[in-house]
Amino acid sequence: MPNVRIFMSFDRDNDEDLHDLLLEQSRAQCSGFEISARSETATMTDRWDEKVRRQISAVDEVIVICGEHTASSVRVKAELRIAQEEQKPYFLLWGRRERMCTRPAGSRRDDSMYSWTWEILQDQIVSTLRNARPREVAERYKRA
């Protein structure tokens, strides 16, 4: 089975170390996922929006790494908005165990933030993708 392609959204000004950690984990031979694209430092313009939209459209799902200042990150908010508009599955990852992490502006009330352990990360990648796929109904159960 091919690796799950991920767009990694994070606060570049404050959480570069979290980016590095997830990137390192993705390179493990048995990870089952790859970071195909990530937040960039480019100025946010219409061109930036189009580029990020193309990148998010090309992945299977989005991981939003949440740190202490994620709620005030305009870039993370925009990336999450694009993921929602493109109907890409995503989940929020609690980036710092010992600190209070904030949800990005624009996140939904029912978006859960998951602890970051290897097992939870693996489970969330698989279940987020599985839950986003339409469920198939056997012919015999369909209404005529």
State what each model feature region is.
Residues 41, 90-100:
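Short beta-alpha junction loops
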Residues 1-58, 138-144:
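Conserved N-terminal substructure of TIR/SEFIR domains
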Residues 59-60, 110:
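Short, well-ordered alpha-helix to beta-strand connector turns
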